[in-house]
């Protein structure tokens, strides 16, 4: 398959998988435990930083224009949901995962990359949640209450997602021919020569 087409197909695939992951959930108070970050981490590990981040940007943009692919629907009004920051955070999270993992097939390196991406996700999501809950909705929640609302209960599930992503992605990269001939900057590894990698 043509390299450009293959990358676009995988980008669309991971945008769709992230959407599906939104509905595989366990409801909580302000958010839900979902499989979204599993697919975000896999996008960064399999597609590289740029294409991985693009897949998540496509997902977020499609939800903002009205497709009901977020946990509680879609549309621009979703920006006023306390959890929207976590959706935005999927984009830099995938970028960080791809940047840290680079071309490595080492599961430990992939786990570290996924952990770094998770930190990026919370770095965007938690301040956004605090802003909406306290400044917009007037909840007046303390720092510890925010941690329990948006992060601490989710960490065990996040750990499982990181382990799964780091376990399956080395095999998938080889089977999908995504591990041959990467450049040195965390781009998508592809089965072509490095000087022919598609840039955008």
Regions found by a protein language model. Give the residues of each.
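Hydrophobic transmembrane alpha-helices
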Residues: 1-55, 65
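Residue-level signature of transmembrane alpha-helical entry/exit and packing/kink sites
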Residues: 3-14, 36-40, 82, 86, ...
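Short helix-perturbing small/polar motifs within transmembrane alpha-helices
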Residues: 13, 20, 77-123
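Interfacial aromatic-anchored transmembrane helix boundaries in multi-pass membrane proteins
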Residues: 21-33, 60-93
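Structural signal for the C-terminal ends of transmembrane alpha-helices
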Residues: 46-50, 96-104, 171-176
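Alpha-helical transmembrane segments and their lipid-water interface positions
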Residues: 52-59, 66-70, 96-97, 121, ...
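Membrane-embedded alpha-helical hairpins and interfacial helices in multi-pass inner-membrane proteins
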Residues: 104-183
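Cationic, low-complexity basic patches in intrinsically disordered or flexible, solvent-exposed regions
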Residues: 188, 194, 200
């Amino acid at each position: 398959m043509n390299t450009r087409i293959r990358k676009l197909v995988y980008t669309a695939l991971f945008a769709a998988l992230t959407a599906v992951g939104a509905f595989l959930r366990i409801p909580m108070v302000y958010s839900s435990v979902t499989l979204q970050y599993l697919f975000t981490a896999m996008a960064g590990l399999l597609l590289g930083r740029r294409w991985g981040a693009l897949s998540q940007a496509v997902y977020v943009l499609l939800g903002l224009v009205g497709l009901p692919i977020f946990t509680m629907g879609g549309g621009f009004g979703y920006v006023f949901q306390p959890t929207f920051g976590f959706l935005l955070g999927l984009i830099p999270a995938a970028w960080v995962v791809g940047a840290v993992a680079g071309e490595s097939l080492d599961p430990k390196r992939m786990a570290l990359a996924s952990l770094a991406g998770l930190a990026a996700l919370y770095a965007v999501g938690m301040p956004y949640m605090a802003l909406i809950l306290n400044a917009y909705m007037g909840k007046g929640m303390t720092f510890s209450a925010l941690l329990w609302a948006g992060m601490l209960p989710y960490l065990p599930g996040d750990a499982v997602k990181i382990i799964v992503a780091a376990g399956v992605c080395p095999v998938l990269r080889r089977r999908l021919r995504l591990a041959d001939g990467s450049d040195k900057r965390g781009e998508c590894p592809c089965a072509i020569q490095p000087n022919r990698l598609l840039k955008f």
